Amino acid sequence: MKHYDVVVAGAGPSGATAAYYLAKQGKSVALIDRAKFPREKACGGGLCVHIEEFDHIISNWDDFLESKCQRGIVYGPEFLPVDYVSEKPFFYNIRRLQFDNKLVEYAVAEGATLIEGIAVKDFEVSEDKVLVKFYASSLSNWSD
């Protein structure tokens, strides 16, 4: 049985970023995901303007950006529209396939171990360890 300082369940943007920072600090990290990367995501690729805070991880956002949103219409009470226009983007659309995969690659490059094709089922916490229980996706029919 392999031992890790940290096990991160889910290698999406949050999990991969957590694994990246933990591995960068010298922790032994297992990054587990039920999918195999690169993988498609059914959900949208919208990110808020705060992605710029991650420039130290991703140096070239143009590799992932589909579009920058600088205008939006919001409907308030009684369905009255409010047209919001900004000189700077306030929302970005990205390609999740490439973006998520690149974050996983960065985590692995820092030393995280990527374990693909299994899902965390449960975990048991004891005084000196946490036991992570999982099953292989080949034994089950997984879908996003």
Where are these regions (language model features)?
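Conserved N-terminal helical subregion
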Residues: 61, 74-144
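N-terminal FAD cofactor-binding segment of flavoenzymes
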Residues: 38-73
